[in-house]
A protein has these predicted regions:
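Positively charged n-region of N-terminal signal peptides that target proteins for export
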Residues: 1-6
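Bacterial N-terminal signal peptides
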Residues: 7-17
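Exported/periplasmic ABC-transporter solute-binding proteins
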Residues: 23-49, 55-57, 62-243
Length: 243
């Protein structure tokens, strides 16, 4: 009986250690604010599948990368590959998530019907994310310049910090139109008057990737997240979020 009791205790202790290890597993993912809903849904599904807790950080890409440089706690950054490749951050792994698309979200009640209407006097305020810090701010200014509209409307452009801030201005009607990404646009389709896709040939393609920082511990949780992104469940989420 003594041997059996000892073996039973060893099994209990072993299971306890495994449970403690699993509970301690955590990932920290930082992402562009325009992909909050995508990251939230992916994180929820990943946690349900693995039991691993996911902490999420959002901001424009300049904010996100600056925080990653200052902190060793961030495991992944999800955002524009071109922007991330120009930073001093060192990455160990990369997984393509999808292609980001620029959308003009028109406020309810605005007279704007097409992007050619941007030059009309009835369009008084146009919001874009900061082009120096946010991917879709850069994409918006590229489009407006390549379309030959920038010089005519720049005095009516309101530059804000992030995509969600642009969204807030559109929903409140404080601007006539705002430039955001498709993922964000899908979330507000019932709160905007009109969503106009922007010609993808008039701005640099936006490839959204998940990059694992080299500073991230080589944990089972991190490896499992890369694998998870390639599953059918994750791909369905990504597709529904406009990527």
């Amino acid at each position: 009986m003594g041997v059996i009791r000892i073996l039973s205790l060893l099994v209990i202790l072993s299971c306890s250690c495994i449970s403690t290890l699993q509970a301690a597993e955590k990932l920290t993912i930082a992402a562009g604010a325009g992909y909050r809903r995508l990251v939230e849904q992916l994180s929820t599904a990943y946690t349900a599948s693995t039991g691993v807790t996911v902490e999420q950080i959002f901001g424009n890409m300049a904010q996100v990368t600056a925080q990653a440089q200052e902190s060793s706690a961030i495991d992944f950054i999800i955002g524009d590959k071109e922007y991330l490749d120009t930073t001093p951050l060192s990455f160990a792994q990369e997984c393509v998530v999808g292609s980001g698309k620029l959308i003009a979200a028109v406020a309810k009640g605005s007279a704007l019907k097409t992007l050619n209407d941007l030059t009309e006097k009835t369009v008084t305020r146009i919001a874009i994310p900061d082009p120096k810090k946010a991917t879709f701010g850069r994409a918006a200014t590229e489009f407006l310049s390549n379309k030959g509209l920038w010089q005519q409307i720049q005095d009516r452009v309101l530059i804000v910090g992030t995509v969600p801030q642009v969204t807030a201005y559109v929903i409140s009607g404080e601007v006539d139109v705002g430039f955001i990404n498709l993922t964000e646009a899908l979330a507000i389709k019932d709160k905007a008057g009109l969503l106009i896709p922007v010609d993808e040939h008039l701005y640099t393609p936006v490839l959204i990737v998940a990059k694992r920082l080299r500073q991230s511990p080589d944990s089972q949780a991190a490896n499992a997240f890369i694998t998870f992104l390639q599953t059918g469940e994750a791909q369905d989420i990504i597709k529904k979020q406009g990527l």
